[in-house]
C-alpha cells in the first residue's frame, strides 16, 4: 500500500501517522478495496490570500466516506467560510488529496483513465485542459460500491503554496 499527496501542500505529522497506521494495520489482499483518506477540518485549510478548492466530505456512522463534493472558490469570511455565496461549515471534513491506497487500486485508476480519455477525445479544449481528478474518480467508485474509504480525522493545520503570498518570507 502507499499514500498519495499533492506536491505543493504541507499536511502535518498526524495525518501521515494516521494514514501509515491504517495501511499497515488494515491492508490485506482480501481488503484491497478498503482505502483511507486524511479528513482535514475546513477551517484548518483555508488560505488568507485567496480562494481554494476542497473536497467537502460526508461520512456514515462508522467514518466511511459516503460523498466527496469538489467545492470551488471557498474563501475565508469574517464569520466562517463561503463558496459562491453559500456558507460552508468551517468544521466540515475536507479532502486535501491525502489518500491511503492499495496496489489493486492502480488497476481501477487505469480503467477510469482510459474511460476519461475516451470521453474527452475530439474535444480540443478538454484534451488540452481536462483534468482526471482523483477525488472525483474515487467518489464515482464509492457510489458504485467498488471501494470503501475510511476518513481518518486530523487536526493538523494545512498550508500550501497556492498563492505566492502563502510562502513564508
Question: For each predicted feature, which ranges?
Answer:
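Conserved core of the sugar-phosphate nucleotidyltransferase
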Residues: 12-99, 103
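Structural beta-sheet core signal
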Residues: 4, 37-38, 151
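Cofactor-binding loop segments of dinucleotide-utilizing enzymes, especially the Rossmann-like FAD-
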Residues: 7, 40, 154
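Conserved alpha/beta core of the MobA/IspD/sugar-nucleotide pyrophosphorylase nucleotidyltransferase superfamily
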Residues: 59-61, 68-169
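Alpha-helix termini
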Residues: 1, 24-30, 116-120
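Short, active-site-adjacent cap segments at secondary-structure transitions
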Residues: 10-12, 158
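Short beta-strand-to-loop acidic/aromatic patch adjacent to the donor-nucleotide binding site
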Residues: 2-10
Amino acid at each position: 500500500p502507499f499514500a498519495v499527496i499533492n506536491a505543493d501542500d504541507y499536511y502535518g505529522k498526524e495525518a501521515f501517522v494516521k494514514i501509515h497506521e491504517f495501511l499497515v494495520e488494515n491492508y490485506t489482499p482480501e481488503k484491497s478495496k478498503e482505502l483511507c483518506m486524511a479528513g482535514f477540518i475546513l477551517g484548518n485549510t483555508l488560505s488568507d490570500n485567496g480562494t481554494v478548492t476542497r473536497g467537502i466530505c460526508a461520512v456514515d456512522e462508522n467514518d466511511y466516506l459516503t460523498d466527496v463534493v469538489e467545492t470551488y472558490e471557498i474563501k475565508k469570511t469574517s464569520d466562517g467560510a463561503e463558496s459562491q455565496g453559500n456558507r460552508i461549515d468551517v468544521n466540515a471534513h475536507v479532502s486535501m488529496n491525502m489518500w491511503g491506497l492499495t496496489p489493486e487500486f492502480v488497476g481501477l485508476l487505469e480503467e477510469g483513465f482510459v474511460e476519461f480519455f475516451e470521453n474527452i477525445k475530439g474535444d480540443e479544449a478538454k484534451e488540452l485542459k481536462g483534468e482526471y481528478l482523483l477525488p472525483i474518480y474515487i467518489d464515482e467508485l464509492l457510489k458504485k460500491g467498488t471501494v470503501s474509504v475510511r476518513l481518518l480525522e486530523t487536526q493538523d493545520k494545512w498550508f500550501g503554496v497556492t498563492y505566492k503570498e502563502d510562502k513564508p518570507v
